[in-house]
């Protein structure tokens, strides 16, 4: 059973805090503005890579073998990431640097800073594919702004594959939880999700789903039979609920 969250922050409602946050990083020397864009100086955070194990020097070395884009040429280092991007398309916000939008790494950090004491949460979750660069960049900003990591513990779940292929819109093999629940029922869906460790990938195939349906059916039948036995033998509820 999932309860509704106490808070449902929106980026559009956090823009004043985002602008102040970015300006604070500029004032501290952790960020710089170039042609209306604002970038974070990754090399100033010695703890960078503490989550993913990635080394800054390896990132720099890797970038030396490829052609840099126009945006990358603006940066002091290829490892630096955008806190703010100037744009004349879509939703735009006014700032001291330009009309534009915040970088997605920054949005999350600022909303956490706004809602939680000292800008730190106990558990930060997300997909394994977000560990780097997204979560690593969140940590870097928190270290620069707060002087400590953004979370005490991290939980990264693996991906769901369909017949051995990554589930993605581009492949057209996306399965929605609501559709699986309608077709197979809540118990089958929950059993399927719990059939593997959250840090291991789940490969969904017709064979796997058939197997899960059989397992759930066995448990449901056993539960019904046990309940019927207790009722027939007049076992008081308070006795078998202990």
Q: Whereabouts are the PLM-identified features?
A:
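N-terminal, positively charged nucleic-acid-binding surface of large information/translation enzymes
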Residues: 1-2
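Acidic carboxylate-rich catalytic motifs and surrounding loops in phosphoryl-/glycosyl-chemistry enzymes
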Residues: 7-13, 157
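Alpha-helical recognition segments enriched in aromatics with Gly/Pro capping
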Residues: 16-229
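Short, intrinsically disordered, charge-balanced linker/junction segments flanking boundaries
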Residues: 238-241
């Amino acid at each position: 059973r999932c309860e509704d969250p106490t808070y449902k922050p929106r980026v559009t409602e956090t823009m004043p805090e985002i602008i102040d946050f970015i300006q604070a990083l500029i004032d501290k020397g952790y960020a710089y503005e170039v042609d209306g864009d604002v970038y974070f100086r990754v090399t100033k955070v010695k703890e960078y890579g503490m989550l993913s194990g990635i080394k800054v020097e390896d990132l720099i070395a890797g970038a030396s073998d490829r052609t840099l884009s126009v945006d990358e040429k603006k940066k002091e280092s290829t490892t630096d990431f955008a806190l703010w991007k100037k744009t004349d398309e879509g939703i735009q916000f006014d700032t001291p640097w330009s009309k534009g939008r915040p970088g997605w790494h920054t949005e999350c950090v600022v909303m956490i800073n706004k809602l939680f004491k000292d800008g730190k949460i106990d558990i930060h979750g997300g997909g394994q594919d977000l560990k780097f660069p997204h979560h690593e960049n969140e940590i870097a900003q928190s270290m620069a702004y707060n002087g400590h990591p953004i979370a005490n513990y991290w939980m990264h779940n693996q991906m769901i594959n369909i017949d051995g292929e990554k589930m993605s819109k581009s492949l057209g093999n996306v399965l929605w939880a609501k559709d699986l629940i309608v077709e197979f029922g809540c118990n089958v869906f929950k059993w399927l999700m719990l059939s593997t460790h959250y840090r291991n990938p789940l490969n969904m195939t017709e064979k796997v789903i058939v197997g899960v349906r059989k397992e759930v059916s066995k448990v449901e039948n056993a539960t019904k039979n046990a309940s019927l036995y207790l009722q027939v033998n007049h076992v008081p509820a308070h006795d078998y609920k202990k």
